[in-house]
């Protein structure tokens, strides 16, 4: 999503095993000393009251940037959050491991927050969740795989048994105060991704989440375009759409085409070792690598904490089919 972040006040650094910067670091002067070991004093974020019968959408992250996606919806006394991700620091932030959204407005209004819905399990959508849940106690709604990945994050922070996790699926409806939200299946580079149809007295808002239109997805489950069309016919107040690479001509290649390339490359390699670099969260790509390796009598070694965790969670939840004895240690 693109636009300007409305939260630009003070910034602070949290220390809890990792150095975490809160706020939009790209707006800072890199020559100024703003790293502290303790939380710096912050001005309270004061937004004007929402006009009667109107809905307010606030972007706490994910605007004009890749990372720390977080959107806040407000109607009268009810608020809810969509996603809570992290971003990785730029070169101007030495010593900082990750950047999370500014939670001040959420903390100041936590009694009005009805919950957080997570659209999918990428770091830029779930990576900041544990830091938020240390400060506010709200339920988390997400699909099966996304819940599995969130559990790993919460366990790392000692929060696993302290947070209410609610598993949901496409076409489910959730009521959060004045809002009723329907989940709509979308294709992405990770399974179980959803878009949202958000209904409130002010109108219908569509938030697509991250998506691509893949007519031949690996799992055979294509984006639910008919459901989006139905909402279009009803009339939509606002569309919040993923726009990554929207300025590039053409369309995104189907993941199945990537699998065909693997078969060709494996044949060319013959008995040589093959090293494949991939995003850890791309389960469908990992599945295709495993399938081709198994068909050609090869073993697969997984390197990297994130990838190892995803393979473990994906196999446990049935999103990855791993033949017996194909995985080997390094």
Residue ranges and their predicted role:
Residues 33-117, 122-330:
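His/Asp/Glu-rich metal-coordinating catalytic cores
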């Amino acid at each position: 999503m693109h636009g300007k972040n409305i939260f630009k006040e003070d910034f602070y650094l949290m220390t809890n095993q990792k150095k975490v910067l809160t706020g939009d670091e790209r707006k800072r002067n890199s020559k100024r000393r703003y790293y502290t070991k303790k939380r710096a004093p912050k001005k309270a974020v004061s937004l004007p009251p929402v006009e009667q019968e109107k809905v307010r959408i606030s972007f706490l992250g994910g605007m004009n940037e890749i990372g720390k996606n977080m959107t806040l919806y407000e109607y009268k006394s009810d608020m809810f959050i969509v996603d809570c991700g992290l971003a990785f620091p730029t070169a101007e932030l030495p010593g900082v491991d990750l950047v999370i959204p500014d939670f001040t407005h959420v903390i100041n209004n936590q009694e009005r927050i009805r919950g957080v819905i997570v659209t999918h399990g990428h770091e830029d959508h779930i990576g900041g969740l544990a830091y938020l849940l240390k400060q506010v106690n709200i339920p988390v709604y997400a699909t099966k795989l996304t819940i599995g990945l969130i559990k790993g994050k919460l366990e790392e922070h000692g929060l696993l048994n302290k947070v209410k996790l609610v598993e949901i699926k496409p076409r489910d409806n959730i009521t959060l105060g004045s809002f009723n939200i329907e989940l709509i299946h979308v294709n992405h580079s990770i399974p179980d991704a959803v878009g949202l149809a958000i209904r409130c007295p002010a109108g219908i808002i569509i938030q697509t989440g991250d998506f691509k239109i893949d007519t031949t997805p690996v799992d055979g489950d294509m984006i639910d375009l008919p459901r989006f069309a139905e909402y279009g016919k009803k009339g939509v107040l606002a569309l919040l759409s993923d726009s990554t690479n929207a300025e590039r001509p053409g369309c995104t290649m189907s993941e199945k085409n990537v699998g065909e390339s693997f078969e060709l490359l494996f044949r060319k390699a013959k008995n040589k070792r093959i090293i494949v670099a991939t995003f850890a969260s791309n389960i469908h790509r990992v599945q295709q690598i495993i399938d081709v390796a198994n068909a050609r009598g090869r073993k697969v070694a997984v390197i990297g904490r994130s990838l190892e965790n995803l393979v473990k969670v994906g196999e446990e939840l049935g999103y990855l089919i791993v033949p017996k004895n194909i995985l080997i240690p390094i």
